[in-house]
From Swiss-Prot:
This is Small ribosomal subunit protein uS9. One of its GO terms (molecular function) is structural constituent of ribosome. The lineage of its organism: Bacteria, Pseudomonadati, Pseudomonadota, Gammaproteobacteria, Oceanospirillales. NCBIfam families: PRK00132.1 (NF001099). Transmembrane segments: none annotated. PROSITE patterns: RIBOSOMAL_S9.
Length: 130
């Protein structure tokens, strides 16, 4: 008899996270590794825990996450977005507090593509008048 689980998909930059919340004791498992093993940076761990700490649910749920693509920062943001969506599925009244903290909105900023004739997306080659 499995407990009810809540699901949320989070995205940030090129990362996608699938988040499953189950009633439990506060375990966070990312790609079959603990959060401390997966993220070396403390800032990334803080970002992941933010929505759970905001609604005082750190000890209520076991969180199982699979995340793909992108780098450390993008993956942490995607996980935060996924946890937020799963929490809203669990209790819709949390939406207001999560929105006021800015976790509900998907951060749509992506890397701008490099253009032909330029060195980077916008950086032009040095101009010489003579």
């Amino acid at each position: 008899m499995s407990a009810t689980q809540y699901y949320g998909t989070g995205r940030r930059k090129t990362s996608t996270a699938r988040v499953f919340l189950k009633a439990g004791s506060g375990n966070l498992v990312i790609n079959n590794r603990s959060i401390d093993q997966y993220f070396g940076r403390e800032t990334a761990r803080m970002v992941v825990r933010q929505p759970l700490e905001l609604v005082d649910a750190t000890e209520k749920f076991d969180v199982y996450i699979t995340v793909k693509g992108g780098g450390i920062s993008g993956q942490a943001g995607a996980i935060r977005h996924g946890i937020t969506r799963a929490l809203m599925q669990y209790d819709e009244t949390l939406r207001r507090t999560l929105r006021s903290a800015g976790f509900v909105t998907r951060d749509s900023r992506e890397v701008e593509r490099k253009k032909v004739g330029l060195r980077k997306a916008r950086r032009r080659p040095q101009f010489s008048k003579r």
